[in-house]
């Protein structure tokens, strides 16, 4: 059966595998706002938080990114990346407008590698962009936490994310 999330109550199908806690986190190449490639996933010397959002130009994604920027401000030993399909130029403008400095904002426009995380929307008005989700990857490169937000227009559970990150760092 196809995996779905809802857009204003209507189901949309997701493309790619369903990652579960304990799975190896695939490496994915994204492009930062400064046009540099960054690899997310896999084993690293820090805990990784990979946040996928549909577009920074929407109110919920804007709020979510600003909130994670604020929440992660004092955390050491964690690398946070917010990934959308927005072009890096728009992401740079967004980061400058809202003083986003504590998370990396990156785009999946070049390789569509986030399909490896099963969050690419495969149909409907949002086909080709990313669903709202949060993945926490431990230092060994294993998925430690997954939150696929069931309704695209809603924010994730921030407290769950923070608690899991604190547990791992």
Curated annotation (Swiss-Prot):
The active site is at residue 61. It catalyses: a hydroperoxide + [thioredoxin]-dithiol = an alcohol + [thioredoxin]-disulfide + H2O. The lineage of its organism: Bacteria, Pseudomonadati, Aquificota, Aquificia, Aquificales. Gene3D superfamilies: Glutaredoxin. GO terms for molecular function: thioredoxin peroxidase activity. Keywords: Antioxidant, Disulfide bond, Oxidoreductase, Peroxidase, Redox-active center. Thiol-specific peroxidase that catalyzes the reduction of hydrogen peroxide and organic hydroperoxides to water and alcohols, respectively. Plays a role in cell protection against oxidative stress by detoxifying peroxides. It comes from the Bacteria. Its EC number is 1.11.1.24. The active site is a conserved redox-active cysteine residue, the peroxidatic cysteine (C(P)), which makes the nucleophilic attack on the peroxide substrate. The peroxide oxidizes the C(P)-SH to cysteine sulfenic acid (C(P)-SOH), which then reacts with another cysteine residue, the resolving cysteine (C(R)), to form a disulfide bridge. The disulfide is subsequently reduced by an appropriate electron donor to complete the catalytic cycle. In this atypical 2-Cys peroxiredoxin, C(R) is present in the same subunit to form an intramolecular disulfide. Belongs to the peroxiredoxin family. Tpx subfamily. The gene is tpx. It is an enzyme of class 1 (oxidoreductase). HAMAP family: Tpx. This is Thiol peroxidase. Residues 19-167 form the Thioredoxin domain. InterPro entries: Redoxin, Thioredoxin-like_sf, Thioredoxin_domain, TPX, Tpx_CS, Tpx_Peroxidase_subfamily. Homodimer. It comes from Aquifex aeolicus (strain VF5). Disulfide bonds join 61-95.
């Amino acid at each position: 059966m196809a995996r779905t999330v809802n857009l204003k109550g209507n189901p949309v199908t997701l493309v790619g595998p369903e990652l579960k806690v304990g799975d190896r986190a695939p490496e994915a190449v994204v492009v930062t706002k400064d046009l540099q490639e960054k690899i997310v996933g896999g084993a690293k010397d820090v805990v990784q938080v990979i946040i996928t959002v549909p577009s920074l130009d929407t109110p919920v994604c804007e709020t979510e990114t600003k909130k994670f920027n604020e929440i992660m401000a004092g955390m050491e030993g964690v690398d946070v990346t917010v990934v959308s399909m927005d072009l890096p130029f728009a992401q740079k403008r967004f980061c400058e407008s809202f003083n986003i400095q504590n998370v990396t904002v990156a785009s999946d426009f070049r390789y569509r590698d986030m399909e490896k995380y099963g969050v690419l929307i495969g149909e409907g008005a949002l086909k080709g962009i990313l669903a709202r989700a949060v993945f926490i990857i431990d230092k060994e490169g294993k998925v430690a936490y997954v939150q696929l937000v069931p309704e695209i227009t809603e924010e994730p559970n921030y407290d769950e994310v923070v608690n899991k990150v604190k547990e791992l760092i």
